[in-house]
Structures are given as structure tokens and as C-alpha cells.
């Protein structure tokens, strides 16, 4: 037996063609390449050969049980390798799999669980009647309450309860809690599924052949529905039923709302949502992985070259729509979606605010803590440390990296110079560690393009001008978030409080349960953020304003 290693999970396309060979060392980024880069057949063949080599190397005629393992009231365990300190209690059936438990991150498998052809990584809990067939479960995942999944991959910190998954690629922090939720043939990450969220990959023609992508941070509301194929942009919110196959990948931070069977797009509006900021803060805190060997390299940044490049594209798409259809049009058409005039103008404004914020952040970070004597010193400091980072960036299910570096790794796999799973993971680790170095190279080029600056002529005054714009953007955005949070304390939010009492009692009941707006921890954090960022900008301006030459 190979104990689950080498099992093919037919992710994304239920009928096959995007199979991922699961193994003990599978990372979200490896799986991303195996599933999506089918336009490079030599690469796929090499990666399959590397995975097969690993599977055969670890094959054995006998299973194994590690040290300090507890197995209690369990039905059948056949062809399974069980790691140290694992707890298996009341489990029905485990067949052909690996449980990669260890002392720092033990695995718990609980009552009524049935797993066939599976791998469960360190620190995970699979409990309460969960059923898995041909599945990979990453580190610190939690599956329970009768969750059922087939041909699916769950990477770090995913949670699945009550519902159902079929052929999904669940990148880090994909969360689904509700009985009525079906995730099928989709790629997700940093995603929260509302109750009754469904997708269809079948149009009753040639079978379940369709697939879709919700980019990082996308969320669905209750009873949302998407007919694949479709692609939803990063950090977007999907509300209602969407059947027209829109691709909003270049319009991130949007709302997709259905009105009378039509998809209406509100671009960029999620940038000012208090929920988006709260999500970005909570993910790093909810990383439950323990131990030194982490399989996935996760970048939590809300604004990165990946999302900002899309905002640049989104801004030009919206400006082109405005130019072609005329400024006075009430409704603009983008692919199969409609955009209202006010939404389009706001979208351009939101994207520009975010671009100012990101580029300003990058400059302030780059010039931090140095007392400059001349403009030439500033120019030298601004010059990037490496040429890597220009061009397009990709989000490989959690890892944000320049496409040039990904291509370099893929070329290495194709020509045979990279031929082990650990070497592939080491390349991802290197990209992750160098993220900020590469990010600055990208930002430096965009600063020149966006602000129309010549790198040999940048002066302290140019920097001061950018920092002032940055300050306006940051404070403006924070004020929008503050106002958005205030809505949660409005009179309509108090509906149902103060049962059987007067208006005053309603307010008192609300304050006892929810607290008051000004002392809310999130609200005070936003106000402190405004204060801190203003001080940060002022400090840089003060440090360089006297430079004249």
C-alpha cells in the first residue's frame, strides 16, 4: 500500500482532466500547478513522476502505528499509516490513508468518521460522522458534524461542517458551516460560504464538466447561487443568483448583486467595508498550525501587487466604459453584468484611493528610519535590491509571488533540475521569504508610471507630495470604514431589542448586549489607525522636508 499517497483526486472538473495526486507533502501551491497548468503537459508529467517516486518510496506491505497513539472503540482500519500522538476514537472506517500526526500537532479522528483513500495532515480534527473519499486534508483543518466530501482538497485552516463538497480546491481558510451549503467544482481561498450557497457544474448537456473560481477573500451570502463557469474577483461579495458566467477577476473588492435575473456589479465598494478589514485582521489570528514544518506559505496582505495590479486594470476598464458609452449613461454593460453610473464613478475613486494607499505604504516603508542629507541619497535608497518582481503577479492559493519566479520554478521542473517534492516546497519558501523585496521592485515601477516620475529626478518634494496624497487616502478610507461600522449601531440595528419595553429600554438592552459605538474595540482600533498613520506620514515629511538640492 502507498497509504493514500498517489491517489488521484479529480478536483475542479468532475469528469477528470485536472487530477491532483495527493501526498504527505502536498502544498496548496503544488496542487495549484497540478490542477491549473494543464497547458504545459511536460510539466504535469514531470510533477506526476515526482509524486509517484515519493509514493513508491514510502510504499509498504504493512501499515504502522506511531508512538503514544490512542485507538478506542474503532471499527475497521486497513492500509493506514498512523503518526505519533494520534487519537482515534469511535471511528467507523479508515481505509488506504495516512494520518500525519506528531507530538507538536496531534491529529484527532472522532466518532462515526469514514475515510477512504485519504491523507490527513498534522494538527487537524476530523470528527462527528465526517465522510471523506479521495480527499486531502491540510494542516489545522477542522471537519465535523456529518460533513461529506469527495475528490476534494482542503488546505491549511479550512473548516467544513454539516454541508457537502464535491471536486473542490479549498485553499487556506475556506470555511463552510451550514447544512444546506454545497461547494462543487470550484477553487476558493479565504472564503466564507453563506447558508444555502450552491453552484452548478452541470447544464444537462455533456455532463458535470464546468468549473469556477472565487479568488481570495470572496464571500457568498445566504442562498447565493453561481452557474459555473464563472470567475469572481478577489474580496468580492456574491449575493443572489448569477447565471450569466461573468468574469470579474479584474474588478476586485466588488459586490455582485442580482436584480431580476441580471448581475449588477458594484466595483471597489468592499474596500470601504468594515467586514473586509475585520476579515484581514482575523485570518492571521486564526492560523492554528503548530510545529515547524508548515506545508503552505500564506500571505495575508489585503493590498499586494496581486490585488493592486487588478485595480489598475479595473480602473482602466471602468474609464474605458465611461469613454465608450458616454459619461451620462445610466447603466454600463461589462461582459454579462450591468454597472450603474454612480457605482462606476465610485469604483474608479475607490481603486485610486487603494492604489495611493499601497504605493504610499511602500515608499514610507522603504525610506523608514534613515536620515537623508540629499535627494541623491533618497534616489539611491529607492532603487530596488533586485530586478525580480516586475510584471504580473499571481496568487497561488495563498502564496503571492511574481509570475516570473513561478515560471522559473516550472522551467526547472520541466528540465529536470528540480525533481523532488522538498525542492519544490523550498522554492515556494524562498518566494514567500523574499515577498517584500520583490514587492518593492514592483511598487517602484508603478510609482514612476502612476505619478509620472523619472527615477533620476525624484526629489524630496515629490515624496512629500505622494505622502500627503497617501495620508488623505488612508484617513479617507478609514473614515469610510468607521461610518460603515456605525451602521451596526443604528436604530434599525436595535430592532427586536428591549422586549416588552419602551424605546429607552430598547436602547439600554442594546447597549448591555452589544456595547456602545465609541467603545467598540474595532471602532477604537480604526481611530487609533488614523492617528498612527497620520503620525507616520508626518514623521517622514519632517525628516525630508529640509532637503533642497
Task: Name these PLM-found stretches.
Residues 62-63, 218:
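Short linear interaction motifs
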Residues 65-72, 77, 82-89:
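Metallocofactor- and cofactor-centric catalytic cores in central/energy metabolism, strongly enriched
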Residues 1-62, 249-549:
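Terminal amphipathic alpha-helical/low-complexity segments used for targeting or macromolecular assembly
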Residues 55-58, 62, 75, 92, ...:
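Surface-exposed loop/turn motifs in large extracellular/passenger domains
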Amino acid at each position: 500500500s502507498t497509504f493514500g499517497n498517489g491517489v488521484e483526486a479529480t478536483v475542479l472538473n468532475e469528469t477528470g482532466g485536472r487530477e491532483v495526486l495527493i501526498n504527505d507533502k502536498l502544498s496548496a501551491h503544488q496542487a495549484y500547478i497540478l490542477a491549473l497548468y494543464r497547458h504545459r503537459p511536460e510539466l504535469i508529467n514531470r510533477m506526476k513522476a515526482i509524486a509517484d517516486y515519493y509514493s513508491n518510496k514510502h510504499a509498504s506491505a504493512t501499515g504502522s502505528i506511531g508512538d503514544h497513539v490512542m485507538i478506542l472503540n474503532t471499527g475497521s482500519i486497513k492500509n493506514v499509516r498512523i503518526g505519533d500522538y494520534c487519537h482515534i476514537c469511535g471511528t467507523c472506517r479508515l481505509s488506504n490513508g495516512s494520518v500525519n500526526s506528531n507530538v507538536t500537532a496531534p491529529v484527532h479522528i472522532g466518532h462515526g468518521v469514514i475515510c477512504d483513500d485519504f491523507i490527513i495532515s498534522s494538527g487537524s480534527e476530523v470528527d462527528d460522522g465526517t465522510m471523506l473519499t479521495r480527499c486531502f486534508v491540510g494542516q489545522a483543518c477542522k471537519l465535523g458534524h456529518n460533513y461529506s466530501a469527495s475528490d476534494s482538497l482542503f488546505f491549511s485552516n479550512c473548516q467544513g461542517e454539516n454541508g457537502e463538497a464535491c471536486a473542490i480546491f479549498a485553499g487556506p481558510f475556506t470555511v463552510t458551516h451550514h447544512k444546506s451549503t454545497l461547494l462543487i467544482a470550484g477553487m476558493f481561498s479565504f472564503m466564507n460560504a453563506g447558508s444555502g450557497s450552491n453552484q452548478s457544474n452541470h447544464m444537462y448537456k455533456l455532463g458535470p464538466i464546468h468549473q469556477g473560481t472565487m479568488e481570495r477573500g470572496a464571500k457568498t451570502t445566504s442562498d447565493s447561487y453561481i452557474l459555473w463557469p464563472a470567475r469572481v474577483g478577489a474580496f468580492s461579495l456574491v449575493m443572489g443568483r448569477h447565471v450569466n458566467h461573468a468574469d470579474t477577476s479584474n474588478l476586485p473588492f466588488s459586490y455582485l448583486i442580482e436584480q431580476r435575473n441580471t448581475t449588477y456589479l458594484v466595483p471597489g465598494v468592499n474596500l470601504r467595508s468594515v467586514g473586509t478589514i475585520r476579515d484581514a485582521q482575523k485570518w492571521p489570528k486564526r492560523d492554528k498550525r503548530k510545529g515547524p514544518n508548515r506545508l503552505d506559505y500564506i500571505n495575508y496582505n489585503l493590498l499586494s501587487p496581486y490585488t493592486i495590479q487588478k485595480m489598475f486594470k479595473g480602473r482602466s476598464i471602468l474609464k474605458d466604459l465611461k469613454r465608450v458609452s458616454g459619461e451620462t449613461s445610466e447603466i454600463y454593460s461589462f461582459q454579462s453584468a450591468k454597472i450603474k453610473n454612480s457605482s462606476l464613478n465610485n469604483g474608479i475613486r475607490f481603486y485610486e484611493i487603494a492604489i495611493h494607499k499601497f504605493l504610499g505604504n511602500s515608499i514610507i516603508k522603504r525610506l523608514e528610519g534613515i536620515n537623508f542629507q540629499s535627494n541623491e541619497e533618497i534616489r539611491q535608497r529607492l532603487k530596488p535590491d533586485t530586478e525580480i518582481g516586475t510584471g504580473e503577479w499571481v496568487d497561488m492559493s495563498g502564496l503571492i509571488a511574481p509570475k516570473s519566479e513561478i515560471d522559473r520554478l516550472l522551467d526547472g521542473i520541466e528540465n529536470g533540475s528540480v525533481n523532488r517534492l522538498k525542492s519544490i516546497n523550498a522554492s515556494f519558501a524562498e518566494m514567500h521569504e523574499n515577498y517584500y523585496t520583490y514587492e518593492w521592485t514592483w511598487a517602484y515601477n508603478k510609482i514612476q508610471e502612476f505619478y509620472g516620475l523619472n527615477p533620476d529626478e525624484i526629489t524630496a518634494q515629490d515624496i512629500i507630495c505622494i505622502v500627503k496624497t497617501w495620508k488623505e487616502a488612508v484617513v479617507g478610507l478609514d473614515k469610510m470604514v468607521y461610518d460603515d461600522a456605525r451602521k451596526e449601531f443604528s436604530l434599525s440595528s436595535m430592532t427586536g431589542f428591549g422586549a416588552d419595553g419602551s424605546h429607552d429600554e430598547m436602547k439600554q438592552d442594546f447597549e448591555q448586549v452589544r456595547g456602545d459605538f465609541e467603545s467598540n474595540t474595532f471602532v477604537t482600533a480604526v481611530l487609533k489607525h488614523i492617528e498612527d498613520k497620520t503620525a507616520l506620514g508626518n514623521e517622514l515629511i519632517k525628516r525630508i522636508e529640509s532637503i533642497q538640492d
